[in-house]
C-alpha cells in the first residue's frame, strides 16, 4: 500500500507526532508502516537479532541506539533476516553498514548515518519499552509511517484509503 507522510500529515496532523528530519533511507523499500516494536541498546546488536528472528508481519522495529554512529547496529545480514521474517521496516537511532547490499534487500530502513564498523554481538539492552529520539516518544504498539520525506507516529492506525491516488 502506498504511503505518503506529507498527505498523512495533511489529513491527520492533530493526531500524529512528526519525527525530526534527521534520518535517511537505506533499505530497498522507501515507504513502510506498521506497529512499533522497540529496542534500546548501545553499540551491540545481539538483542536486535533475537527480535528479528520473530515473525514481523505488520511490524516496524525501532532501535534506540543512543544516536551513536561509531558502530553500525544494522548490517546486510540482519536486514535480510528481517525481510525473510516479514518485518515491514527498521528505524535506527544510530548507524547502518553495507549500504550497497542494504539497498537490494526488500525492507525499509531509516537510520542516522552509515559507518563500516560493525556492532558487538552482545545481547545487552531492553525491549518493549518507551524510547525517545527525534523529538518523539515511541511506545510499543504505536503505529509508525515512513517514506523518503519523513517519519510520523500515531497511537492508532491511520486510514490510508483516505489518501489521494496519484
UniProtKB/Swiss-Prot annotation:
The keyword Cytoplasm applies. GO terms for biological process: regulation of RNA metabolic process. One of its GO terms (cellular component) is cytoplasm. It comes from the Bacteria. InterPro entries: RraA (IPR010203), RraA/RraA-like (IPR005493), RraA/RraA-like_sf (IPR036704), RraA_gpbac (IPR014339). It is found in: Cytoplasm. Pfam families: RraA-like. CDD domains: RraA_family. Belongs to the RraA family. Homotrimer. Binds to both RNA-binding sites in the C-terminal region of Rne and to RhlB. This is Regulator of ribonuclease activity A. The lineage of its organism: Bacteria, Pseudomonadati, Pseudomonadota, Gammaproteobacteria, Pasteurellales.
